[in-house]
Amino acid sequence: ASHPEFDTLFGAVSISNEHSDMARALISECMLESFQAEQKFLNNVEPVAPLSVSAKVWSREMLATLCHVPLVNKLVGCCDPGKALPILLRHYLSLNGKFVCFSVNKAFNDSLDGLILVDLSKVPEKYMKRYLGAEGLENYQKHWKNQVQADNDSA
């Protein structure tokens, strides 16, 4: 809220190694198929330690039809009974987060970390208000309205 000039947030979301490699591969590939960041971000980042899984039971074509959050959640439960998509991952998706890549994090108990970007201009207003507060949201909106106006004036 104190820096309305920033419009993109990034960070990691972890998928615990308590999920099987098959479930983690399914999650990561579905996220990259349906919720992938823009190409300009993909060109500059690559995973340090990609998750390697053999004998996948899906094709890329299947992923395009499978990748709806409730369905992926059910499939994860089929791979790993009692497990589901991590809550934080689902939350970032509700903010319209986009994934850049996934990498196994050896320093964090072999979790599978996804690099995610959140474009604040695409976050639903109810979440912006929750996280920034009414005044912070107003400042953010005012800043970007002025920025767009300045860009239009200079064009």
Predicted regions: what they are:
Residues 103-105, 115, 128-132:
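Composition- and surface-driven signal marking solvent-exposed, interaction-prone regions
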Residues 33-34, 123-125, 149-151:
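Short, intrinsically disordered/low-complexity patches at protein termini
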Residues 36-44, 124-138:
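Short, basic, helix/turn surface patches
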Residues 1-113:
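Acyl-donor binding region in acyl/amide transferases
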